[in-house]
């Protein structure tokens, strides 16, 4: 058998041409179908799980299902321009968002693009949205307080920096109000805030941004908005994008606070994406990994130690701990906290603040049920003066709730029971607080001191809040040094306590009450 040189060259040429084509096929594919923002792509044999894909007309997607002969991907943004037969390219990158201090004061979408009409964001740094949470060795215990400025929370359910505290309740019980008040309360405290709005009406998000601007809170806040009109994929990924933006500050030895409003809608969006990708449904039609959806997100909120920060910054920041505090919000249906998603998130977080419709309708706002609200780690981080003064509040409230139920049926009550009921009524009234008015530490300390020491026992229940306001005005006018000391030291020394007692007695004697 003789080989013709021309045949050999032709054979090699065809082999080389075929080699080039096969290499191209591995990084380029064809859209087979498009349905509700989900595309099925053939030919992307080199794609990674979670990789960004480039569609025509500068549209991007994320590969979520890697199957034998096709890839299931979600389109981020408008999918109406994507059609069958379009060419799709791999990018070799996991989904990233811009990070850095330049984002403060801006409203961005899930991809970090500005949507507030104030022009592009000038940041050069980006980071991936899916990251592994810090390990056990990298963490520090929660020991620094994060003041919410809300009387009921700071006294009974204290939150520490690096904690995950769930806010749970039915619709229209004031969940967002608690979170927004907490953001406003961080003014001047060196805490960067991230507010992630998931599946909300655009008008509602606009109202929150406007309120934050009114109270000067937008200058240290980033708003990540995935409105109800955005695709399910954008809503599901928004929480991870916001978390990455908050982690930027945590990893550099700073403190950050992130609010997820709310994770129920994120779970709904993820369920929608999973069902469209034809993943097998489980309980309540959620996919099997819905617990992991929330656990991998909330575990990224942590207080990290000095070694972690120093290693991350290559020695640029030394001797500083960083923290990311998370306030996830969950919406329940008819108070059912034993549903699938609420029980998942309760088990992941370090405590929960439970808001009740009945209390809200009765005018107790914030409508916090102190009996079943708990902070598992915040006690160690509570401000000393508040810890000292708030011990009796929860007990008074618990006894009042118990006795109030019996008092409805009993006609004659003994004096001790009557006193407890009267004290309880005053505690409930004192813990009421108008929205957008978070308190400073000294204001909360004075209120707790007055109720604990019986100074409110002879004040009419309807006059409690007016008494509290007048007392604070009196202290501002005549005892400015005292309240400044309490605010600075966060403690109540014996001398200061004696001065405070004298000041309250003087106010009661010569004031309007």
Curated annotation (Swiss-Prot):
Give the positions of the site Required for activity: 373
* Location relative to the cell: Cell inner membrane
Q: Does the keyword Glycosyltransferase apply?
A: no
Q: Which GO terms describe its molecular function?
A: ADP binding; ATP binding; proton-transporting ATP synthase activity, rotational mechanism
Instruction: Identify its membrane topology class.
Output: Peripheral membrane protein
Q: Do you know which PROSITE patterns this protein is assigned to?
A: ATPASE_ALPHA_BETA
Q: Which domain of life is it from?
A: Bacteria
EC number of the protein: 7.1.2.2
One Pfam entry for this protein is: ATP-synt_ab_C
Per its UniProt record, what InterPro entries does this chain match? ATP_synth_asu-like_sf, ATP_synth_asu_C, ATP_synth_asu_C_sf, ATP_synth_F1_a_nt-bd_dom, ATP_synth_F1_asu, ATPase_a/bsu_AS, ATPase_F1/V1/A1_a/bsu_N, ATPase_F1/V1/A1_a/bsu_N_sf
Show the GO cellular component annotation of the record: plasma membrane; proton-transporting ATP synthase complex
Q: Which CDD domains match?
A: ATP-synt_F1_alpha_C, ATP-synt_F1_alpha_N, F1-ATPase_alpha_CD
Q: Which amino acids does the record list as binding ATP?
A: 169-176
Top enzyme class: translocase
Q: Which reaction does it catalyse?
A: ATP + H2O + 4 H(+)(in) = ADP + phosphate + 5 H(+)(out)
In which broad location class does this protein mainly occur, judging by the first location in its UniProt entry?
Answer: membrane
Cell inner membrane listed as a keyword: yes
Extent of the signal sequence: none
Quaternary structure note? F-type ATPases have 2 components, CF(1) - the catalytic core - and CF(0) - the membrane proton channel. CF(1) has five subunits: alpha(3), beta(3), gamma(1), delta(1), epsilon(1). CF(0) has three main subunits: a(1), b(2) and c(9-12). The alpha and beta chains form an alternating ring which encloses part of the gamma chain. CF(1) is attached to CF(0) by a central stalk formed by the gamma and epsilon chains, while a peripheral stalk is formed by the delta and b chains.
Return the HAMAP family for the record: ATP_synth_alpha_bact
**PANTHER family, alphabetized:** ATP SYNTHASE SUBUNIT ALPHA, MITOCHONDRIAL
Q: What does this protein do?
A: Produces ATP from ADP in the presence of a proton gradient across the membrane. The alpha chain is a regulatory subunit.
Q: Which family does it belong to?
A: Belongs to the ATPase alpha/beta chains family.
UniProt protein name = ATP synthase subunit alpha
Q: Which organism is it from?
A: Bordetella parapertussis (strain 12822 / ATCC BAA-587 / NCTC 13253)
Q: What is the lineage of its organism?
A: Bacteria, Pseudomonadati, Pseudomonadota, Betaproteobacteria, Burkholderiales
Which gene name belongs to this protein?
atpA
């Amino acid at each position: 058998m003789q080989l013709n040189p021309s045949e050999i060259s032709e054979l090699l040429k065809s082999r080389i041409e075929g080699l080039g084509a096969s290499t191209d096929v591995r990084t380029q594919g064809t859209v087979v179908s498009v349905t509700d923002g989900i595309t099925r792509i053939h030919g992307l044999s080199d794609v990674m799980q979670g990789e960004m894909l480039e569609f025509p007309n500068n549209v991007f997607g994320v590969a979520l299902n890697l199957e034998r002969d096709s890839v299931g991907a979600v389109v981020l943004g408008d999918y109406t321009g994507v059609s069958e037969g379009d060419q799709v390219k791999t990018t070799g990158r996991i989904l990233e968002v811009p990070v850095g201090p330049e984002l403060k004061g801006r409203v961005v979408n899930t991809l970090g693009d500005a949507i507030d009409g104030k022009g592009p964001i000038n940041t050069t740094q980006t980071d991936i949205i899916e990251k592994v949470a810090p390990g056990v060795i990298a963490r520090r215990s929660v020991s620094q307080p994060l003041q919410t400025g809300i009387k009921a929370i700071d006294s009974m359910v204290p939150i520490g920096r690096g904690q995950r505290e769930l806010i749970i309740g039915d619709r229209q019980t004031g969940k967002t109000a608690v979170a927004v008040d907490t953001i406003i309360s961080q003014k001047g405290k060196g805490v960067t805030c991230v507010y992630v709005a998931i599946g909300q009406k655009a008008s509602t998000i606009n109202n929150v941004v406007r309120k934050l601007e009114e109270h000067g809170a937008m200058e240290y806040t980033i708003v990540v908005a995935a409105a109800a009109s955005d695709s399910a994929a954008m809503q599901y990924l928004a929480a991870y994008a916001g978390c990455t933006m908050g982690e930027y500050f945590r990893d550099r030895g700073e403190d950050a606070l992130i609010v997820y409003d709310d994770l129920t809608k994120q779970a709904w969006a993820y369920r929608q994406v999973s069902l469209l990708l034809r993943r097998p449904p489980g309980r309540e039609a959620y996919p099997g990994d819905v617990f992991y959806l929330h656990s991998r997100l909330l575990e990224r909120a942590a207080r990290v130690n000095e070694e972690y920060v120093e290693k991350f910054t290559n020695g640029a920041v030394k001797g500083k701990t960083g923290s990311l505090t998370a306030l996830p919000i969950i919406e329940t249906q008819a108070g059912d906290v034993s549903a699938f998603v609420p029980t998942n998130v309760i088990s992941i977080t370090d405590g929960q603040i439970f808001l009740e419709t009945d209390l809200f309708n009765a005018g107790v706002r914030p409508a916090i049920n102190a009996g079943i609200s708990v902070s598992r780690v915040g006690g160690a981080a509570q401000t000393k003066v508040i810890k000292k003064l708030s011990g009796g509040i929860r007990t008074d409230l618990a006894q009042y709730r118990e006795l109030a139920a019996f008092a409805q049926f009993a006609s004659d009550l003994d004096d001790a029971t009557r006193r407890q009921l009267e004290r309880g009524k005053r505690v409930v009234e004192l813990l009421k607080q108008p929205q957008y008015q978070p308190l400073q530490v000294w204001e909360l300390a004075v209120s707790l001191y007055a109720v604990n020491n019986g100074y409110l026992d002879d004040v009419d229940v309807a006059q409690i809040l007016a008494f509290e306001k007048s007392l604070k005005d009196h202290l501002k006018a005549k005892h400015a040094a005292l309240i400044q000391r309490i605010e600075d030291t966060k403690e109540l020394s014996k001398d200061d306590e004696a001065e405070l007692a004298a000041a309250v007695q003087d106010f009661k004697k010569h004031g309007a009450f």
